[in-house]
Amino acid sequence: MDRIVEIEKVSFENDFEVSLRPSKFEDYIGQEKIKQNLDVFIKAAKKRNECLDHVLFYGPPGLGKTTLAHIIANEMGVSIKMTAAPMIEKSGDLAAILTNLQEGDVLFIDEIHRLSPAIEEVLYPAMEDFRLDIIIGSGPAAQTIKIDLPKFTLIGATTRAGMISAPLRDRFGMDFRLQFYTSSELSRIVQIASAKLGKECDKNASLEIAKRSRATPRIALRLLKRIRDFAEVNDEQIISHERAKEGLNALGVNSLGFDEMDIRYLEILMQARRRPMGLSTIAAALSEDEGTVEDVIEPYLLANGFIERTAKGRIASAKCFETFNVKIDIEKGLFE
């Protein structure tokens, strides 16, 4: 099922998103603490004429990990090479990428938690000593050839930091968890994006879109593009608050940013009446894979207190029952 609030796991953006990407920290909205720290570390590295230490970004999808990687490369004055872990199937694939880097380049690996152990073994000496250890042959006759690499900065991005092996994580000089955005931050992002689309957006309209965007910029931009369609069909140059609400309601995104899938998820938990449910059970009931449930649906619900994770599974919170005006002990149904 396609969702207007869905976020693709592989975060290589389309042309529209690329056109909106800021190139400097001062133009990047949100993630203030991360920006401040990175700005210091980059200035220090440039002052010493060194590469920036390897960086790990983690957190829910759509929060700006790829954008920050591009800003780092731009601020360092170097090129960025991009790939994703699923594309690196053999050690030779990684070796080809590493040997084609130039001095100081940034290598961005998305979904880095999906690297195989064999690939990680090749990556360790590259990260620590900027060296490739190539094993030729097998058994007692095997030989190791060492190839020097140019110094580079690896930036890893993941939605599942817990799946990154400890040895790999330890080799990053810094790691940052990206936080959800405030409605005010998202409203500013929507205003900037709408101007680039050649469409003025009323302040209340941009705030309405922001409030229904699950605190995620990528979703806010996706909703904005669809609301623009509603305005254009009605020959309106300005996106009004009423038009924004009409469009969002038509898209099935409610005032909390929930769509049909979120409601189904919460219904399943509320029907359990505070009995914990396992991830596999929930995923089966939704006809979704466990990764999508855990990485895409749950983070926003958890962050806003609608669900709780216990040692035995997931439960709907008291806030969830109150929001939907559901009593835990009712027998006839959920939404009466």
From Swiss-Prot:
Superkingdom classification of source: Bacteria
Tell me the segments the record calls region Small ATPAse domain (RuvB-S): 182-252
Residues noted as binding DNA in the record, renumbered to the chain:
309, 314
Pfam families assigned: AAA_lid_4, RuvB_C, RuvB_N
Under the heading SMART domains, the entry gives: AAA
Q: Where does ATP bind?
A: 20-21, 62, 65-67, 128-130, 171, 181, 218
Q: Which residues form a coiled coil?
A: none
The annotated region (Large ATPase domain (RuvB-L)) lies at 1-181
Q: Where is this region: Head domain (RuvB-H)?
A: 255-336
| Function of the protein | The RuvA-RuvB-RuvC complex processes Holliday junction (HJ) DNA during genetic recombination and DNA repair, while the RuvA-RuvB complex plays an important role in the rescue of blocked DNA replication forks via replication fork reversal (RFR). RuvA specifically binds to HJ cruciform DNA, conferring on it an open structure. The RuvB hexamer acts as an ATP-dependent pump, pulling dsDNA into and through the RuvAB complex. RuvB forms 2 homohexamers on either side of HJ DNA bound by 1 or 2 RuvA tetramers; 4 subunits per hexamer contact DNA at a time.
Q: What is known of its domains?
A: Has 3 domains, the large (RuvB-L) and small ATPase (RuvB-S) domains and the C-terminal head (RuvB-H) domain. The head domain binds DNA, while the ATPase domains jointly bind ATP, ADP or are empty depending on the state of the subunit in the translocation cycle. During a single DNA translocation step the structure of each domain remains the same, but their relative positions change.
Q: Which family does it belong to?
A: Belongs to the RuvB family.
Name this protein carries in UniProt: Holliday junction branch migration complex subunit RuvB
Organism in which the protein naturally occurs: Campylobacter concisus (strain 13826)
Q: Which gene encodes it?
A: ruvB
